[in-house]
Amino acid sequence: MVGLKPPEVPPTTAVKLLGAGTAACFADLLTFPLDTAKVRLQIQGENQAARSAQYRGVLGTILTMVRNEGPRSPYNGLVAGLQRQMSFASIRIGLYDSVKQLYTPKGSDHSSITTRILAGCTTGAMAVTCAQPTDVVKVRFQASIHAGPRSNRKYSGTMDAYRTIAREEGVRGLWKGILPNITRNAIVNCAEMVTYDVIKEKVLDYHLLTDNLPCHFVSAFGAGFCATVVASPVDVVKTRYMNSPPGQYQNPLDCMLKMVTQEGPTAFYKGFTPSFLRLGSWNVVMFVSYEQLKRALMKVQMLRESPF
């Protein structure tokens, strides 16, 4: 490592974990209203309260929420969302390279597509297992409809939501929907990480761009699009099942079958536009920030370790 420039120094696992969590939080701050709009569109038609809102399109959903529930409503669940990213993104993104190296055969300096997919599935599943309670609380806040600042709220705050869910639904309620969420995030993580990894690798191999902002932007945009196309059906089932009151669905499969019979197969792509807008922009902000944060953190680490 001596003599290498900061961008060339391989980042440590700690740097990757911190950088991934911080970059994901920054991306969430910028794109959270799109995620909330996606949740509202995904559950629309599921019950009378959601049906009466008549959400139409991304911008229409956000404007309806602001008009009926106040300007802060698109950011309902942000605290839980940031808690989720610090635990969730740190693992699924920060540990991806380490797990990929673990699965790569000894003596090989190149990871196959299969190895990358396995790494993406592994870190995605690990992240969901740790961060599921934060995701449940985030979805509950995003899906809750308030007529105004004085309307009855089921949860007084984020910590109250954790306590209330655990008290009323048991500790298992905090891990509600974990199986569809593991499926969804294994798929999303593969689509995001593998697509980003491959596009970036090919762009650099063919000298189309240097390892800098334009390369990171192109790779991240492609990753966001692929992730949205592949993961939307599972994402809708996950959102509905996690937000449902006890007894509405027996299990995720029952939720899926009821969606097909009551709303048709197009229900699985409800909220696709905000999903793409959100995942596309989220990936661009996150990956670009992540790459820059890794370099900045390595510079700081090298300065601290330097004897001069």
Curated annotation (Swiss-Prot):
Region Purine nucleotide binding, residue ranges: 275-297
One Gene Ontology term of the molecular function aspect: oxidative phosphorylation uncoupler activity
Primary localization class, coarse: mitochondrion
Keyword Iron annotated: no
Listed InterPro entries: Mit_carrier (IPR002067), Mito_Metabolite_Transporter (IPR050391), Mitochondrial_sb/sol_carrier (IPR018108), Mt_carrier_dom_sf (IPR023395)
Cellular component annotations (GO), alphabetically ordered: mitochondrial inner membrane
Topological domain ranges for the Mitochondrial matrix compartment: 33-73, 134-179, 234-267
Membrane protein topology class: Multi-pass membrane protein
Keywords: Membrane, Mitochondrion, Mitochondrion inner membrane, Repeat, Transmembrane, Transmembrane helix, Transport
Keyword Mitochondrion: yes
Entry's transmembrane regions: 11-32, 74-96, 117-133, 180-196, 214-233, 268-290
A GO BP entry: mitochondrial transmembrane transport
Function: Putative transmembrane transporter that plays a role in mitochondrial metabolism via an as yet unclear mechanism. Originally, this mitochondrial protein was thought to act as a proton transmembrane transporter from the mitochondrial intermembrane space into the matrix, causing proton leaks through the inner mitochondrial membrane, thereby uncoupling mitochondrial membrane potential generation from ATP synthesis.
Similarity-based family: Belongs to the mitochondrial carrier (TC 2.A.29) family.
Subunit structure and binding partners: Interacts with HAX1; the interaction is direct and calcium-dependent.
Listed name of the protein: Putative mitochondrial transporter UCP3
Organism: Sus scrofa
